């Protein structure tokens, strides 16, 4: 009797293992993990919700910043990394691959009560490097300019400093860890200036035109708004994604996703 029970138990375990192998018992089989750029919150959340509704596959998003997301892919801690800058040469050399999902404007933002409405790239650079320190020098109030930016490793910061040619030269008063924090800080200080993803900008701040061009989907698409950068999906070159992650990746980069990407305030790459 004991032998029969033991045999039945072994058969049951074997059967369970076989079912697991065929349909997948791990929760990760039905979950796609993404990690990285805080600026990509709106577009990834929208794409994830639509994908989950259609497939039943859960998409998680860990808003850690571009640099941390790239590192997470490299270390195998997530399926797809999210970066609001192109990969650097050394990152590509380490075995990573970038696929551009969309293009986003970096809005130069001030408090709504600030009378300044337009700056050129050269003036923005002079402000952030400390050559221009008072708003009165650019047609504003007689007040010290408070420089708000992102932390080192941020894709938004990398894009902003690359475009304005201010790498390692900015005199930040505060270096914040998310797009939302920059917007909130500028909204609460009449003398502050900051930069943030256009897709995340709210009515609590005022976006400036740059060289006479306001940031919008149209001006980003035609290139006339010059302060823009890519939203990049980061994966390991030569390494297969899980079936669920591959399905999500293919969905995001298909024309089917373009309407959702546009609805999130950014310009689809394809």
Enumerate the language-model features and the residues they cover.
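Intrinsically disordered, low-complexity segments enriched in Ser/Pro/Gly/Ala and basic residues
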Residues: 8, 25-26
């Amino acid at each position: 009797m004991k032998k029969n029970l033991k045999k039945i138990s072994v058969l049951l375990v074997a059967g369970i293992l076989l079912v697991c192998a065929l349909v997948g018992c791990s929760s990760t089989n039905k979950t796609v993990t993404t990690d990285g750029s805080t600026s990509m919150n709106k577009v990834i959340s929208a794409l994830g919700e639509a994908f989950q509704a259609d497939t039943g596959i859960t998409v998680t998003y860990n808003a850690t910043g571009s640099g941390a997301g790239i590192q997470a892919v490299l270390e195998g801690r997530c399926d797809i990394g999210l970066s609001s800058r192109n990969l650097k040469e050394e990152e590509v050399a380490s075995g990573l691959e970038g696929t551009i999902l969309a293009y986003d404007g970096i809005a130069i933002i001030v408090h709504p009560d600030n009378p300044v409405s337009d700056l050129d790239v050269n003036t923005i650079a002079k402000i952030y490097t400390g050559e221009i320190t008072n708003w009165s020098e650019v047609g504003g109030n007689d007040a010290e300019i408070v420089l708000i930016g992102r932390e080192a490793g941020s894709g938004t910061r990398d894009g902003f400093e690359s475009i304005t040619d201010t790498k390692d030269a900015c005199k930040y008063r505060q270096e914040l860890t998310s797009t939302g924090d920059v917007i909130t800080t500028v909204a609460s200080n009449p003398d502050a200036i900051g930069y943030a993803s256009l897709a995340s900008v709210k009515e609590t701040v005022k976006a400036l035109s740059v060289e006479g061009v306001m940031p919008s989907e149209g001006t980003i698409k035609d290139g006339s708004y010059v302060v823009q950068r890519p939203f990049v999906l980061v994966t390991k070159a030569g390494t297969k994604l899980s079936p669920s992650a591959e399905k999500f990746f293919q969905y995001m980069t298909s024309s089917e996703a373009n309407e959702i990407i546009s609805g999130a305030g950014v310009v689809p790459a394809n």
